[in-house]
Amino acid sequence: MKINIIYWSGTGNTEAMANYIKEGANAAGADVTVKNVAEAVAADIECDVLCLGCPSMGAEVLEENEFEPFIESIEGIVKGKNLALFGSYGWGDGEWMRDWTQRMETAGAVIVAESLIVNETPVGAECIDFGKSLVK
């Protein structure tokens, strides 16, 4: 099973989540690639599960300079793709993740796991378990 994890991180929390998720998915037998969104291309959606991570920014939105343009570039081609979402936040109640999940479902993606959100610093075990859950 091939899992691609693409993320953007400002403080390092979402990057840490990506690496823990990789650890869990690897432990469950998946072949996992982790990329910062700055290195990602639309072809990276060609995998068994695409796992996207972005923290909440500003008024609970996705990061606008790198991550949002990537999401816009794949929004028209994610129909039928298995997708999982994760991210960290410093305040608020997770509205950005609910909005993002709805947006991807509207685009036709198949959400394969309940989105993982953490306040500030991630707990490794929680992220590792999320990674394991992606391997079916």
Show where each model-derived region lies.
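Extreme N-terminal starter segment of soluble prokaryotic enzymes
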Residues: 1-4
